[in-house]
């Protein structure tokens, strides 16, 4: 039940060794994203948020079998094309287009993974609930970090059983408040 309390759990994630990002690839991607990022790098939609989304997502993926590579990339890309921290209804679409560009240059995701990632990024702010488990895991990873903007995640707006687990929900919320 609460495997994620001590660390990101190991589980049955759907990915191969070829899909995993190594540290060098992760740093390269983050530097590319940083060079064009328009907001405060340490702000509410910046790298601290991405780190928490990554942790939340990988914790759930290792339990529910979502593709870890897609979940990790989602964390780094979903807010990468925001023009400001307020309402920016098109940032998901811009980030999905950016994701497709990056796949040609850096990401090298397989077609199914790229389709999942682009869909998750494009629709992450739309309030949807129904999708592939990988997409749902991405959305929940982001929603679990709402405390940073003064909101409490609502259980009925979470897609996965893992995100609705009271232990993870509380842990993620407390982490989100620390900014």
Give short role names for the model-derived ranges:
Residues 9-20:
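Short, Lys/Arg-enriched N-terminal segments with co-localized hydrophobic residues
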Residues 18-24, 38-66, 77, 105, ...:
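Divalent metal-dependent phosphate-bond-processing catalytic cores, especially two-metal-ion Mg2+/Mn2+ enzymes
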Residues 25-29, 66-73:
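Short coil-to-beta-strand
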Residues 53-54, 90-105:
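An active-site-proximal "capping" alpha-helix that borders the catalytic cofactor pocket
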Residues 68-86, 91, 95, 118-125, ...:
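His-Asp-centered metal-binding catalytic motifs of divalent-metal-dependent phosphohydrolases/nucleases
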Residues 110-115:
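Membrane-interface starts of transmembrane alpha-helices
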């Amino acid at each position: 039940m609460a495997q994620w309390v001590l660390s990101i759990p190991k589980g049955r994630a759907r990915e191969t060794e070829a899909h995993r990002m190594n540290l060098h690839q992760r740093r390269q991607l983050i530097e590319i994203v940083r060079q064009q990022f328009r907001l405060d790098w340490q702000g509410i939609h910046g790298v601290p948020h991405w780190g928490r989304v990554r942790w939340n997502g990988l914790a759930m993926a290792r339990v529910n079998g979502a593709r870890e590579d897609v979940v990790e990339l989602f964390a780094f890309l979903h807010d990468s094309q925001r023009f400001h921290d307020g309402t920016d209804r098109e940032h998901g679409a811009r980030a999905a287009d950016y994701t497709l560009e990056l796949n040609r240059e850096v990401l090298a995701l397989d077609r199914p993974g790229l389709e999942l990632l682009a869909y998750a990024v494009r629709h992450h702010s739309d309030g949807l609930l129904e999708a592939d488990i990988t997409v749902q895991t991405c959305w929940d990873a982001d929603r679990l970090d709402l405390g940073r903007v003064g909101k409490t995640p609502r259980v009925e707006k979470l897609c996965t059983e893992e995100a609705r687990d009271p232990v993870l929900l509380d842990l993620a919320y407390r982490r989100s408040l620390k900014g």
